[in-house]
Amino acid sequence: MAPVEDGGGVEFPVGMKVLVVDDDPTCLAVLKRMLLECRYDATTCSQATRALTMLRENRRGFDVIISDVHMPDMDGFRLLELVGLEMDLPVIMMSADSRTDIVMKGIKHGACDYLIKPVRMEELKNIWQHVIRKKFNENKEHEHSGSLDDTDRTRPTNNDNEYASSANDGAEGSWKSQKKKRDKDDDDGELESGDPSSTSKKPRVVWSVELHQQFVNAVNHLGIDKAVPKKILELMNVPGLTRENVASHLQKFRLYLKRIAQHHAGIANPFCPPASSGKVGSLGGLDFQALAASGQIPPQALAALQDELLGRPTNSLVLPGRDQSSLRLAAVKGNKPHGEREIAFGQPIYKCQNNAYGAFPQSSPAVGGMPSFSAWPNNKLGMADSTGTLGGMSNSQNSNIVLHELQQQPDAMLSGTLHSLDVKPSGIVMPSQSLNTFSASEGLSPNQNTLMIPAQSSGFLAAMPPSMKHEPVLATSQPSSSLLGGIDLVNQASTSQPLISAHGGGNLSGLVNRNPNVVPSQGISTFHTPNNPYLVSPNSMGMGSKQPPGVLKTENSDALNHSYGYLGGSNPPMDSGLLSSQSKNTQFGLLGQDDITGSWSPLPNVDSYGNTVGLSHPGSSSSSFQSSNVALGKLPDQGRGKNHGFVGKGTCIPSRFAVDEIESPTNNLSHSIGSSGDIMSPDIFGFSGQM
């Protein structure tokens, strides 16, 4: 029985035809029993495809449809779309899924209601409202389409009456007439899509699957924007089909497409937010603008760093280092008897000449905001090449090296000529791994305020006694057991310092020069091993240049002839009472045999051919040291007339840090050497009276 439109009849909604679609037979049985209690005419179906067939065969056989959302053969939303396009019946969705997004999806697809399982009796009693609402909307549309011709015929008369009313009634009547005119114009605009010639109701057309497919083909042929009812009707060419039928179906089809587009847009937006083209404010955790404004980094270095981080090719190179720890020590100031003599750690960025360095390992793409660099090649440092290239790259490439932080890189080694660099006072120089691999025509000459720290560990600086922080320190890159091996380095402010030579645990000896204000005695000391005697000169640091070139023997030689030992004779005598032999085998920072005897004896200077040329330090004290078990390294055979790893004037210190090129104010210091190419400086190892 069809529902009564006014709702006042006693029989309504008795006999309202309801189609229930659900794959659960139990749910179907319960719903059918509840609908019968509400005095509805209920029909059940367990398959969505079969229900769609029943609707197409007998569209007027049902007033409302109740469908489950999740079904195996067809989704409930798909059934909702097909029913909305073909039959235009009210559809109520039901499901045990009460999520808001699922309910919203059903409403967007055109469902008039959404019931949550288990369905209550009160909800089923009120489903007739959707049927009445649907019928009311259809009747309203037909009334508007039927009164269109009457509106067109009465428009001139109404306009004349309005103008007459405005002339007779004054301003108030004019405002009312204009308002009525605007309302009628709006109504005319809304009714333009209808058929002007239709003055009576037309029979409803059942849009079957074949008819709807013809309609869709016609729309696709014309295009959704250019499809109009007249052209669609011509393309379909179906007898009995009117322009009004096509216009109504086209309107529903467009609404359906609009709902689908809105649904897909709403689903895609949370997962695909619009891409923002924000500018890169900082890279690698660095605020470039703040650095440039505070003057901590020059504009050229800023541009080079930005280019490197952004992956653009540039001649500048940034060396952030392997680890992100930097050498941050406070500036330590010492006495200044000869001018500027302070060593500052954590200084600003050093720069060198454009042709000082060449190719470094190229940076890989940034990870975590900072560019990563490939591993440095573990090459030994050889300086036989004098063509001005470093690592295979010409000096003319003008690569500016910006040290972002002073960091330690154990595996990093530079290869090439470094003779164009001098060490700046208060600079920090990091030597390479092993100094016994030097091969150059010039020696190494650090200036008086130069600090050479081991490249292997930064613990050397932290463990440095306070007294050593006042003077320059020169140490090898290998861990020096003599610097950390139980030696008291506290300056006792005595008039003389005892003699000690440090020997490291690696291939090279540790090397420290402090240049105290009061120098030790003048005698040249010697300590012998079974094979190699070598000189130790107190208060010596630089290589003397007044003697003939020294001859360094190879591993098979029994002795090393030295020509570096001329020292001034103005030093005060040394208090030999400070020297004492030890009962334990702590000698030069190493543990040896207990057969150590100590004495002093003057040693003549010898030239490169073994001839005595004079005493370097005439004095009254005579003592010597004997040791049978001292670990001493030997130099490889590098040829005659070359200084293997010695420190001399006019050369540079190999370092992975770039420093400014400047001449040292002090160049007249003397040197003495050991068998492994290290400078033995006795005046800086103070031990409180014992060795």
Swiss-Prot record:
Region of interest: Disordered: 139-204
Response regulatory domain segment(s): 17-132
A single GO BP: cytokinin-activated signaling pathway
Predominant location: nucleus
GO cellular component terms, semicolon-separated: nucleus
Post-translational modification: Two-component system major event consists of a His-to-Asp phosphorelay between a sensor histidine kinase (HK) and a response regulator (RR). In plants, the His-to-Asp phosphorelay involves an additional intermediate named Histidine-containing phosphotransfer protein (HPt). This multistep phosphorelay consists of a His-Asp-His-Asp sequential transfer of a phosphate group between first a His and an Asp of the HK protein, followed by the transfer to a conserved His of the HPt protein and finally the transfer to an Asp in the receiver domain of the RR protein.
SUPFAM superfamilies tied to this protein: CheY-like, Homeodomain-like
GO molecular function: DNA binding; DNA-binding transcription factor activity
Keywords: Activator, Cytokinin signaling pathway, DNA-binding, Nucleus, Phosphoprotein, Transcription, Transcription regulation, Two-component regulatory system
Subcellular locations according to the entry: Nucleus
Signal sequence segment: none
SMART domains for this protein: REC
Coiled coil: none
Family under the similarity heading: Belongs to the ARR family. Type-B subfamily.
Xref: PANTHER family: TWO-COMPONENT RESPONSE REGULATOR (PTHR43874), TWO-COMPONENT RESPONSE REGULATOR ARR2 (PTHR43874:SF67)
Described function: Transcriptional activator that binds specific DNA sequence. Functions as a response regulator involved in His-to-Asp phosphorelay signal transduction system. Phosphorylation of the Asp residue in the receiver domain activates the ability of the protein to promote the transcription of target genes. May directly activate some type-A response regulators in response to cytokinins.
Protein name per its UniProtKB record: Two-component response regulator ORR21
Source organism (scientific name): Oryza sativa subsp. japonica (Rice)
Gene encoding the protein: RR21
